[in-house]
Regions:
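ATP-binding/phosphotransfer module of carbohydrate and carboxylate kinases, centering on a glycine-rich
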Residues: 2-65, 183-336
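Active-site nucleophile and cofactor-binding loops and adjacent substrate-binding regions
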Residues: 43-45, 86-87, 106-113, 132-135, ...
Length: 336
C-alpha cells in the first residue's frame, strides 16, 4: 500500500543506521542544507537474518523503491565485504545494491555517520557539559557507548568544509588506573583473552563491570555463577539511588569513559568532544556529578589543554540517520 504522505515528486533516498541491536531506517529528502527525515523506524536485528532482509521489510512497509541509499553500519568498512562487529551479519556492498535495486549505495561506519551529523545539530539536540561555550571548533572527537564503543574524527578545512575520518578507536586496549579497574580487567581478561575499552564502555560493558565488582565483593555468593544484570536495569537502579552496587557500577563506567575520552581528545588534537550512543543520554545528570570530568582532565601536564576542550552529549534521537543523509547530500553535491 502506498503512503499518501510521501510526495512522489521528492527524490527520497533510503538511509540506515545498523548497530548490533537495532536496524534503524528512514526516508530522507537531502535537498535542504539539513536533510529532512521521514518515516523513521527501528527494527530489532535479532528478528532478521540479514541487512538485506531488514531493509526489504522496511521498504515494503512503505511501498517505496529508492534509487539511492546511504547506510551506516557498526563495522570497519574497508572493502566490498562488510562484517558487523557485534552481530552475525555480513554482506557484499555490490550484491546488496543489486538486491535492493539501487543506482548507488554508500556504506559508512556508524560513528562516521554520527560525526557527519554534528555540524547539522541544533543547540537543542546537544547538551553542554564542560569547557568553553563557543561555536563548533575542529577537530571534533565523536565517541560513544551503545552496543559497542564507536569513535570518529570530524575535521573542517580552510574552505569551511567538513570531512570525517572513521576509526576503530573503541578497540584500543583498556588501561586500568585503580585497583578496582585492575580487578575488572582481570575478570575480563579471563573471559575474553584481551580487554579493549569497548569491553567496558558499551551496554554489555555495564553488565561486565557490575558482575566483576559483585564477584569481588561477595565471592562466595557468585562462585560458579555469572548471571549478568541487564544494562538498562543497572542504570535504572543506579538512578533510583537505592542500589549501592548499581551506583558503584555506573560511577566506574563514567570514570572509565572520562579517561578514554581524554585520551581520544589528546590523540585527535580535539577542540570539541561529542559523546553519542544510546546509553549516556539516559543519565546526563549522573555523568555530570560523576568522576568523568576529573578523569577526563587527569592527563598530567595537559590539564590546561583539555580544560579548553568543549564537551557535549548528543541528544538527537537518531544522529546516525541524520549523518547518513548529510553524507549522501555531500556526495551528491560533489558530483554535481
Amino acid at each position: 500500500m502506498s503512503n499518501p504522505n510521501i510526495d512522489p515528486n521528492t527524490d527520497w533516498v533510503l538511509v540506515g543506521d545498523i548497530g548490533g541491536t537495532n536496524a534503524r531506517f528512514a526516508l530522507a529528502d537531502i535537498r535542504p542544507a539539513r536533510p529532512i527525515l521521514y518515516a523513521e523506524q527501528s527494527l530489532p536485528t535479532s528478528d532478521y537474518a540479514s541487512l538485506q532482509h531488514a531493509a526489504e521489510t522496511y521498504l515494503a512497509q512503505h511501498a517505496f523503491k529508492p534509487k539511492r541509499a546511504a547506510i551506516a553500519v557498526a563495522a570497519a568498512v574497508t572493502g566490498d565485504a562488510v562484517q558487523l562487529t557485534n552481530r552475525a551479519w555480513s554482506f557484499s556492498q555490490i550484491e546488496l545494491q543489486t538486491a535492493l535495486g539501487l543506482e548507488s549505495l554508500t556504506i559508512l561506519n556508524d560513528f562516521g555517520a554520527v560525526a557527519y551529523a554534528v555540524p547539522a545539530l541544533d543547540d537543542s539536540e546537544r547538551e553542554y557539559l564542560y569547557g568553553p561555550q563557543r561555536a563548533l571548533q575542529s577537530p571534533v572527537t565523536v565517541l560513544g557507548p551503545g552496543t559497542g564503543l564507536g569513535m570518529a574524527i570530524l575535521l573542517q578545512d580552510s574552505a569551511q568544509q567538513w570531512s570525517v575520518q572513521e576509526t576503530e578507536g573503541g578497540h584500543v586496549s583498556f588501561a586500568p588506573l585503580s585497583e578496582e579497574e585492575q580487578l575488572i580487567a582481570r575478570w575480563l581478561n579471563a573471559r575474553f583473552g584481551r580487554t579493549s575499552n569497548e569491553r567496558l564502555l558499551c551496554g554489555a560493558g555495564l553488565s561486565h563491570i557490575d558482575a566483576a565488582l559483585a564477584g569481588a565483593e561477595h565471592p562466595s555468593l557468585h562462585a560458579g555463577s555469572e548471571t549478568l544484570r541487564e544494562p538498562s536495569k543497572i542504570v535504572q537502579l543506579a538512578l533510583d539511588g537505592h542500589d549501592i552496587s548499581a551506583r558503584r557500577t555506573l560511577a566506574r563506567f563514567c570514570a572509565v569513559l572520562g579517561s578514554v575520552a581524554g585520551d581520544a581528545a589528546l590523540i585527535h588534537g580535539a577542540r570539541t568532544l561529542m559523546i553519542a550512543g544510546g546509553i549516556v543520554p539516559r543519565f546526563i545528570p549522573f555523568l555530570k556529578s560523576s568522576g568523568f570530568r576529573e578523569r577526563f582532565l587527569s592527563k598530567g601536564r595537559f590539564v590546561a589543554y583539555l580544560e579548553n576542550v568543549a564537551v557535549y552529549v548528543i541528544t538527537h534521537p537518531n544522529p546516525g540517520l541524520l549523518g547518513a543523509s548529510v553524507c549522501l547530500r555531500a556526495e551528491s553535491n560533489a558530483i554535481t
